[in-house]
Amino acid sequence: MPTVVVMDVSLSMTRPVPVEGTEEFQRKHLAVHGLTMLFEHMATNYKLEFTAMVVFSSLWELMVPFTRDYNTLQEALSNIDDYDKTCLESALQGVSSVVQQEWGASIPSQIVLVTDGCLGIGKGSLQHSLATLNQRNDSNRFPLPFSFPSKLYIMCMANLEELQGSDSLEYLERLIDLNNGEGQIFTIDGPLCLKNVQSMFGKLIDVAYTPFHAVLKCGNLSSDVQVFPRPEPVITDEEIDPLPKTINTDLEVVGFIDIADISSPPVLSRHLVLPIALNKEGDEVGTGLADDMEDENSANQIAGKIPNFCVLLHGSLKVEGMVALVQLGPDWHGMLYSQADSKKKSNLMMSLFEPGLEPLPWLGKTMQLGPITDAKENPYGEEDNKSPFPLQPKNKRSYAQNVTVWIKPSGLQTDVQKILRNARKLPEKTQTFYKELNRLRKAALAFGFLDLLKGVSDMLERECTLLPDTAHPDAAFQLSHAAAQLKLASTGGSEHGAYDHNIVPLQTDFSGRNSDRI
């Protein structure tokens, strides 16, 4: 999940902050101190995060493009200049441009906006931007909500009392609301000083940049791992009173399945699984991603001497061409698999399925899967030439049938004309006539288009009166019968208006075999 740090470099950030016993600080210095702390934490505990830095006043500038080199980011902090007035809309437009150019519109991102709470003056101020929100067209729309999934964290170099006194807090809260409620505002508790700034950025780290550590288990084997990026809580829409579901810190492998059987399933998110090496005393050595070559070699030497289940599992899945089903929580599963990063390098990945008993319909209920040895005969065949999957659904899925689409008038007109063409060819086209008639009837009932049924009924009655003298007598009977059935369905009552009811041909006999002879 990439991060964009957005630093306010307007003149208001140069306002002095009295600090007892030391030289005078500016709010800009407090912001630099907090960001330095954040970058140091990420360099140690969140090394895989791609981070960019944007500065803004009335305009915006990309100081550092997306990188994992936190030394470059810290150097950029020391080269920041002071500019003119604040324009938050310009900054947010810059963020949108930077993220979409690098990552597109589907990758979730985190935005850390560091400002002093001053909203600017005149045109370009946040007050003006929000006041004209409903007067814009698509060409100059406000950048929030972003076109990509995002969380907006606003770090204010001011305390709560100062923001409330200037009404700035209300406008900043509007930004979070415009971002679909995704994000949070952080303020300094107490007086403005380095210690309180550290405390504020510490809260941000706890919320967004704490690494997710877990224990990967399979039977008696286990391994400490880091899951990156950290999995987000999931809220299911189907529940009446939904609660966010979080994955367990104990990830238990419950079985293995062929890659061909799992296919390419829909997933909520994908994560890298990294082994955490521990020394003999149980202290954490790390994931092997060290800052310099000397530390990296030392960490790799230590990690290489210790057997690790995570490494064993990764290699086995890669060689055998299988995935591991892993229990994430109650009625919630995911899969572990090897994904090639290049010709020589691959990574152990974890994908999260939708919570539920049957996340992948072609596998059936996950809890009912079992080992091959439980089956009476090998479901894959003696020569491994067949598969028990996919399971055939009990009911036909909607996509297995021809769906009736009436988005345009021409689609409805075509379906009605098809019925009329078959009506003129009765009784030869009796089966086709009733098939098309029932298809139109079901679609009309599904859409609540009861007037259509009455209209088609009137058309069939008219066709009946226009039949030529040479027409087969059965045609008139079938048309009258179909028209009457549609008229009953158009009332919406009785069994004739039921969706599952089908109109069947009227049974007639013109052979004379059943007539009485004198």
From Swiss-Prot:
Superkingdom: Eukaryota
BP term (GO), one: RNA polymerase II transcription initiation surveillance
Tagged with keyword Nucleus: yes
InterPro entries xrefs: INTS14, IntS14_b-barrel, IntS14_C, VWF_A, vWFA_dom_sf
Binding, Mg(2+): 10, 12, 86
Domain VWFA: 2-204
Subunit text: Component of the Integrator complex, composed of core subunits INTS1, INTS2, INTS3, INTS4, INTS5, INTS6, INTS7, INTS8, INTS9/RC74, INTS10, INTS11/CPSF3L, INTS12, INTS13, INTS14 and INTS15. The core complex associates with protein phosphatase 2A subunits PPP2CA and PPP2R1A, to form the Integrator-PP2A (INTAC) complex. INTS14 is part of the tail subcomplex, composed of INTS10, INTS13, INTS14 and INTS15.
Protein family (similarity comment): Belongs to the Integrator subunit 14 family.
The name this protein goes by in its record: Integrator complex subunit 14
Organism: Xenopus tropicalis
